[in-house]
């Protein structure tokens, strides 16, 4: 089996530890262990004192009952037994695609998007066609393109919402139409929902609550600010959950027992995390928008209150060279747009510490001025 190099992950693996001002990541500023445990007034010592004599044995195969119940409560129609714990959303996507896609299948994805959603199907022998998001259309999903691409042999439509890297959302009306199109050919719809928006005016809806063959993947990495515990999940109906169980045994035995505990703790206190993160997004997005308004060499379609944005750069050199030179000269890290097959752009993660964002943007402006 052949698979393409994973552009974003390869870039970050090579360069992120050299960054002084990392404005490339797409998570919201990570919680410390003390902050996470302290959400309900518990201190770290107390939290671990209760667990110090527990054996570090295998955990729950599919996630603890408490975990499954907390995750199921995030949806309107999903039963706890149909939640399967995974190693982050990447593990959830891998599980779903590994279970469903076969050589000769037809898959529809979007571009740009998270590379996993189309290169895993390609590696399994599927043909992949793309709905191309266009900057001049504010990166909005084109339903007419989707209708033209879907065919009787289409097995699955693989998307993400909000989109990585652009931060744009598949709103309720669009999602319902996607389900309607998929239903005409009995195709599955997988949506990576790891960037569920924090302020959406009721426009965000999970695919699993819209479509009987919908697959929602998600994790605690982005919206919930704890990527380090590596906990994600699939949410589906009962038939798909049963299919996934068989394949999951080959990809993951269980999550860590402490990770499951911390995940449950986070989900039980999710309103406090979301309140904190709404504040970070609102304040930092205002900083980003003001910077863009004053920066003549940058354009931005504003993200939908999610933690990733995608800027257009007016530069002469290729974006990868630009980003390497920027990092080496200033310590500022971006992800070049070419990692998403869109050159002359860059992913800018604006939900880091405010001081990091402000200094990073200032240095980026100084570097852009030198390009004249």
Describe the residue ranges of each PLM region.
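PLP-dependent aminotransferase-like
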Residues: 73, 101-159, 180
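PLP-dependent enzyme catalytic core of the Aspartate aminotransferase-like
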Residues: 77, 148, 316, 325-334, ...
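Structural signature of PLP-dependent enzymes
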Residues: 244-248, 266-289
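Conserved glycine-rich beta-strand-loop-beta hairpin in the small C-terminal domain of fold type I
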Residues: 264, 280-289, 300-313
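N-terminal small-domain helix-loop-helix segment of the aminotransferase-like
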Residues: 2-88, 371-372
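Helix C-cap/helix->beta junction micro-motif
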Residues: 124, 184-185, 295, 330, ...
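Active-site PLP-lysine loop of aminotransferase-like
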Residues: 210, 214-229, 239-256, 338-339
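Active-site pre-lysine segment of PLP-dependent enzymes
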Residues: 122, 129, 140-153, 165-188, ...
């Amino acid at each position: 089996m052949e698979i393409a190099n994973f552009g974003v992950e390869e870039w970050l693996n090579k360069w992120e530890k050299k960054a002084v001002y990392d404005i490339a990541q797409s998570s919201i500023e990570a919680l410390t262990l003390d902050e996470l445990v302290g959400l309900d007034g518990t201190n770290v010592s107390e939290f671990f004192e209760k667990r110090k004599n527990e054996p570090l044995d295998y955990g729950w195969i599919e996630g603890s009952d408490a975990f499954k119940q907390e995750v199921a409560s995030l949806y309107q129609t999903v039963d706890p037994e149909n939640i399967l714990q995974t190693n982050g959303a990447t593990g959830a996507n891998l599980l779903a695609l590994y279970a469903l896609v076969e050589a000769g299948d037809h898959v529809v994805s979007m571009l740009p998007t998270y590379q996993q959603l189309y290169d895993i199907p390609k590696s399994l022998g599927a043909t992949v066609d793309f709905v191309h998001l266009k900057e001049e259309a504010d990166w909005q999903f084109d339903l007419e393109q989707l209708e033209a691409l879907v065919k009787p042999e289409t097995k699955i439509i693989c998307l993400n919402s909000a989109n990585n890297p652009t931060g744009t959302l598949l709103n309720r009306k669009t999602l319902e139409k996607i389900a309607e199109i998929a239903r005409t050919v009995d195709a599955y719809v997988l949506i990576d929902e790891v960037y569920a928006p924090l302020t959406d005016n009721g426009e965000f809806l999970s695919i699993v609550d819209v479509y009987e063959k919908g697959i929602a993947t998600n994790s605690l990495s982005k919206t919930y600010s704890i990527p380090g515990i590596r906990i994600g999940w699939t949410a589906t109906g009962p038939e798909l959950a049963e299919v996934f169980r068989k394949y999951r045994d080959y990809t993951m035995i269980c999550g860590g027992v402490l990770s499951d505990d911390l995940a449950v703790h986070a989900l039980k206190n999710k309103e406090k995390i979301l309140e904190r993160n709404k504040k970070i997004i609102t304040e930092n997005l205002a900083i980003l928008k003001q910077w863009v308004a004053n920066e003549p060499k940058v354009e931005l379609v504003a993200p939908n209150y999610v933690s990733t944005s995608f800027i257009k750069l007016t530069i002469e050199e290729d974006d990868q060279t630009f980003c390497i030179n920027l990092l080496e000269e200033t310590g500022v890290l971006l992800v070049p747009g070419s990692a998403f097959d869109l050159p002359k752009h860059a992913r800018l993660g604006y939900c880091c510490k405010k001081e990091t964002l402000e200094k990073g943007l200032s240095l980026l402006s100084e570097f852009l001025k030198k390009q004249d």
